[in-house]
Amino acid sequence: MADYILFMHDDAPTYDAGGWDVYLQTLKTNGAFEGGSEIGGGICLRKGVPAADITRHLVGYIRIAAGTMEEAKSLLAGNPHFEAGGTVEIRELPRT
């Protein structure tokens, strides 16, 4: 089992936010949910030099457990952001 992070981009049309409760409960029932949150404002820092601007197009994340990238992709079913046409970026979180 590997850990993956789903990043929601700020490009979804308006959708019913009430769908999140059902989606997150489904992930929990399947044993896939590892956490998540909306992403607020912040800053980028770099020692000794100016840093780039923050990544503003990321608005939320969910951490999941899945056996493969294909399984992680299948867990997007019912994700309100994805179902509304928004972009979801899936990244594996390597174990070190």
Residue ranges and their predicted role:
Residues M1-T96:
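Conserved, structured core segments of small domains
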